[in-house]
C-alpha cells in the first residue's frame, strides 16, 4: 500500500515524502510519545521505497528508538527528534541525515495555557542541550519551524526558530555556517530527479 501511495504522490507532482514513524510528544508524561513507534524494518522499507522512486524522505520522529530507526533507515531529514540521547546524536553525526529540531513547536506553547509550563520546561531544556551537543559534535542541522503547529504561525515560525538557535548558541559566524550547511544539504537532497 505504501508503494502505491508513493507512486500516486509522484504522479501528482510531489517533491518529497514525509513519514511519521512515532507519535506526538506526550506533554503529560515527559520523555514519552503518544502511540507506538513503527518497527525498524518497516521504516527501512518505507525509506527504501521512497528513495527508489526518486524521493527524499522527511521523518517526523521522536524518542530514542524511533530516531535510531529513522537514522539507520537513511531518512534524509529527521524532523523534531525530541528525547534523543548522546548515542543517538553520535549516530546522527555519523550519518547523512540532517536534523531539523523545530524548537518553536514546544517553546511557543509557554504561557499559552494549553499545557502547564512546568510540563513544557523540561522538554525545552533537554532540546536546548541536544542542540548544544549537536553543534559540538557537528551533527548536520537545519532550521525548520513546523509552521501550522499550534502557536507556530507561517512566516513567523522560521524567524522564531532562528532566534531560538541564537539564544542557545549565540550568533557567531560558526553557528550561521553550521545552519547554512544543513540547509544546503537539504536543498540538494530534496531536488527531484
Please identify what each model-predicted range represents.
Residues 33-42, 121-128, 157-161:
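Charged helix-capping and loop-helix junction motifs
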Residues 52, 115, 125-193:
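His/Asp/Glu-enriched, well-ordered alpha-helical/loop segment
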Amino acid at each position: 500500500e505504501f508503494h502505491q501511495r508513493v507512486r500516486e504522490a509522484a504522479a501528482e507532482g510531489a517533491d518529497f515524502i514525509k513519514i511519521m514513524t512515532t507519535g506526538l510528544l506526550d506533554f503529560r508524561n515527559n520523555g514519552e510519545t503518544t502511540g507506538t513507534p513503527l518497527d525498524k524494518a518497516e521504516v527501512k522499507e518505507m525509506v527504501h521505497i521512497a528513495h527508489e522512486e526518486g524521493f527524499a524522505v522527511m521523518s517526523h520522529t521522536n524518542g530514542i528508538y524511533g530516531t535510531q530507526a529513522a537514522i539507520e533507515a537513511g531518512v534524509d531529514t529527521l524532523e523534531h527528534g525530541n528525547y534523543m540521547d548522546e548515542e543517538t546524536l553520535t549516530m546522527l553525526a555519523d550519518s547523512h541525515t540532517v536534523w531539523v529540531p523545530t524548537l518553536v513547536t514546544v517553546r511557543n506553547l509557554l504561557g499559552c495555557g494549553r499545557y502547564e509550563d512546568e510540563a513544557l520546561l523540561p522538554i525545552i531544556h533537554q532540546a536546548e542541550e541536544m542542540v548544544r551537543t549537536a553543534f559540538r559534535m557537528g551533527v548536520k542541522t537545519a532550521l525548520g519551524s513546523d509552521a501550522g503547529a499550534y502557536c507556530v504561525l507561517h512566516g513567523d515560525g522560521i524567524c522564531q526558530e532562528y532566534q531560538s538557535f541564537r539564544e542557545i548558541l549565540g550568533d557567531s559566524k560558526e553557528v550561521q555556517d553550521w545552519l547554512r550547511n544543513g540547509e544546503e544539504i537539504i536543498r540538494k537532497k530534496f531536488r527531484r530527479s
